[in-house]
Amino acid sequence: MVVDLPRTDPEGWDADRMPEVPIAQTVVWETHVGDFSNDPAGGFPESHRGKYLAFTDLGTTLGGHPDFPTGLSYLKKLGITAVQLMP
């Protein structure tokens, strides 16, 4: 089998750029995909819990309370600049 990799690139692939965060200001968070989004009170759709898809959910909160963000909103509040995902 031969794969034509450029054909697999989604639209805008070549325009995508990594955020420019100086290494001294980089804060890395390591998490398991399941642990990140498994809690039913975390505000994630049930079909996204424990899956990579949960990282696409914006504005999630604990129990619907706006003062307690979850997911990427929580990491942003902490100042996390990079996430290492564990399966």
Predicted regions and their residues:
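N-terminal structural segment of carbohydrate-active enzymes
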Residues: 1-87
